[in-house]
Regions:
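Catalytic-domain carbohydrate-binding cleft regions of carbohydrate-active enzymes
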Residues: 1-203
Length: 203
C-alpha cells in the first residue's frame, strides 16, 4: 500500500546492475598493460569469475607526473598551473598502457566491466590531452596554461566535464567511474557537497 503509493509519486528506485554483485578486482598498484591482462588470465585459469576490472589512479600520469611532464623543471609547480600533484588526471599513462584502447577491448573480451579511479578535485591542467578543448568550451585562454578549476556548481563546467573528459573514454570501453573522495565537503554553491553531486551526475 504505502510503498506502492510512494513509488507512484517518486518512481521506482534504480537497481544496481547485476554485474555489480559479482567479484571485483581492485588493487592500488602500478600495473602495466601486459601485466594486468596476465593477472586477469590467472583468474580465468583458476576458474575464478570476475565481473569488474578496476584500474586505480595509475591509469593516468600519477607517480611519475612531475618527471614526465617536467612540471617543476618548467617552473610550473605553482597554484596558477595546478602544481605537480598526481591525484587528478585524465591522460592515459602511455608508459604503462601504450595502447589503452586495445587494453579495454582485451578486458571486455574476458567478460569484465571496466571502471577507472577518479580524483577530479585538481581540475584540468595544462599538460592534459583535453586541456585545449576544455579551455575552449569554457571560454578560457589556453595559451596561459592556467589550471581549469573543478567547479561542480557550474553548469558549463559540468557539461564540459562529461562531454570532453569522460564520454570519449566511455566510447572506448570504460563502463563507469570510481569516484574516490578528494573534493572536500564544500562547493561554490552553499550546501552542495561535491561528492554527493558527483555521485548523482555520474549515476
Amino acid at each position: 500500500g504505502a510503498v506502492k503509493a510512494l513509488y507512484m509519486i517518486t518512481g521506482a528506485p534504480p537497481l544496481v546492475p547485476r554485474f555489480a554483485l559479482g567479484n571485483w578486482w581492485s588493487r592500488y598498484y602500478a600495473y602495466t598493460q601486459d601485466g594486468y591482462l596476465r593477472l586477469l588470465q590467472r583468474f580465468e585459469d583458476r576458474k575464478i569469475p570476475l565481473t569488474v576490472a578496476t584500474l586505480d589512479m595509475d591509469w593516468h600520469w600519477s607517480k611519475t607526473l612531475d618527471e614526465v611532464k617536467k612540471i617543476t623543471e618548467l617552473g610550473r609547480n605553482t597554484e596558477f598551473y595546478g602544481g605537480n600533484n598526481g591525484w587528478t588526471g585524465y591522460s592515459w599513462n602511455t608508459d604503462l598502457f601504450p595502447d589503452y584502447k586495445k587494453l579495454l577491448r582485451d578486458i571486455k573480451e574476458k567478460g569484465c566491466k571496466i571502471t577507472l579511479n577518479l580524483h577530479p578535485a585538481d581540475g584540468v591542467r595544462w599538460f592534459e590531452n583535453q586541456y585545449n578543448d576544455m579551455a575552449n568550451a569554457l571560454g578560457k585562454d589556453s595559451s596561459t596554461g592556467e589550471r581549469i578549476a573543478f567547479d561542480i556548481a557550474d553548469d558549463d563546467f559540468i557539461n564540459a566535464y562529461f562531454k570532453i573528459l569522460h564520454k570519449p573514454y566511455e566510447k572506448d570501453g570504460v563502463d563507469f567511474w570510481w569516484i574516490d573522495w578528494q573534493q572536500g565537503e564544500k562547493s561554490d554553491l552553499d550546501g552542495l557537497d561535491p561528492l554527493w553531486s558527483l555521485n548523482h551526475y555520474h549515476y
